Amino acid sequence: MLHTLHRSPWLTDFAALLRLLSEGDELLLLQDGVTAAVDGNRYLESLRNAPIKVYALNEDLIARGLTGQISNDIILIDYTDFVRLTVKHPSQMVW
């Protein structure tokens, strides 16, 4: 399943998101959700312990001036890669 987090993790039920993640799921951070990828924050630490791959939309990182603050554990993608993820995962959960 593809999970997409488009809101700030501070304004989301992040604990519920973590509970619903399963091995093999993937999480895409976009819009304000990219703030979860900032190195050193508590949300990133939780994601590091999850059995998933975490992606962030590079254009949203650039728009928020966060490119130099993102953890190396996060896979940066563009809109073409975003489309590939949606094709790969017919089931999606939006947060």
UniProtKB/Swiss-Prot annotation:
Signal peptide: none annotated. One of its GO terms (cellular component) is sulfurtransferase complex. InterPro entries: DsrEFH-like, Sulphur_relay_TusB, Sulphur_relay_TusB/DsrH. Keywords: Cytoplasm, tRNA processing. It is found in: Cytoplasm. It comes from the Bacteria. Gene3D superfamilies: DsrEFH-like. One of its GO terms (biological process) is tRNA wobble position uridine thiolation. Pfam families: DsrH (PF04077). Heterohexamer, formed by a dimer of trimers. The hexameric TusBCD complex contains 2 copies each of TusB, TusC and TusD. The TusBCD complex interacts with TusE. Part of a sulfur-relay system required for 2-thiolation of 5-methylaminomethyl-2-thiouridine (mnm(5)s(2)U) at tRNA wobble positions. This is Protein TusB. It comes from Escherichia coli (strain ATCC 8739 / DSM 1576 / NBRC 3972 / NCIMB 8545 / WDCM 00012 / Crooks).
